[in-house]
Amino acid sequence: MTTTSSKVAIKPLEDRIVVQPLDAEQTTASGLVIPDTAKEKPQEGVVLAVGPGRFEDGNRLPLDVSVGDVVLYSKYGGTEVKYNGEEYLVLSARDVLAIVEK
């Protein structure tokens, strides 16, 4: 699995990961522009940093995601964080629903 690694200067602890949400669709299939107020929260993002995993019964459990993975996550999971002008989401590994295969 993974060790602690990062593409940003944020080091998540335990079983947390830092994700950069992918932008929501700007237009509909018919070409209508979607205003920011009507956009759904994104549920897909790129993993930028991975914590070392949590301890259970004295053993550290590695995470199933790696830096660079594109993941689907719970719509209202995690904490939104702004750092150096960028927006990130800090999620527990439990909030990750799936890894998107390329």
Swiss-Prot record:
Listed CDD domains: cpn10
Keywords: Chaperone, Cytoplasm
GO molecular function: ATP binding; metal ion binding; protein folding chaperone; protein-folding chaperone binding; unfolded protein binding
GO biological process: chaperone cofactor-dependent protein refolding
Subcellular location: Cytoplasm
ATP-binding in keyword set: no
The protein's name in its UniProt record: Co-chaperonin GroES
Organism: Streptomyces coelicolor (strain ATCC BAA-471 / A3(2) / M145)
Name of the gene: groES
